[in-house]
Amino acid sequence: MAKKDAAPPPPISISDAEAQVMEVLWQRHPQGADEIAEALADRQDWQLATIKTLVNRLFTKGAISAEKDGRRYLYSPLLRREDWLSSQSLGLIDRLFQGRLTPLVAHFSAQRKLSAAELKALKQLIQDYEND
């Protein structure tokens, strides 16, 4: 019997607060909860207990790993930023634009005037897509 290819794992859903912790870990890892709190101190007025709760949720979801370091744990991302961005982007397109790119581009170009550089980049993307 032929072995079936395993389906990709479902995307990991993370909250906006958890995403802030992930951004810190994507920039530098491993880090302890105290280091994460320090990195977020200028953006958030979160207590260390809040950081530990968010870290625990991320660990439970499989987004980060934890390695014992004496009396504390050091955390590293398992979820790649690129994978998370891709999942978030596709989810947005699916939810708001029924998976279609044309209405997405039309909406954003109506909301904000595209610069000449942005138009050039979009044209290049279309040309590259047509050539593939």
Language-model regions, residue ranges each:
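Short acidic, hydrophobic short linear motifs in intrinsically disordered regions
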Residues: 31-39
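Short, cationic-aromatic polyanion-contact patches
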Residues: 13-17, 69-88
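Hydrophobic residues on short alpha-helical segments
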Residues: 19-25, 105
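Short helix-coil junctions and helix-kink-helix linkers
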Residues: 38-46
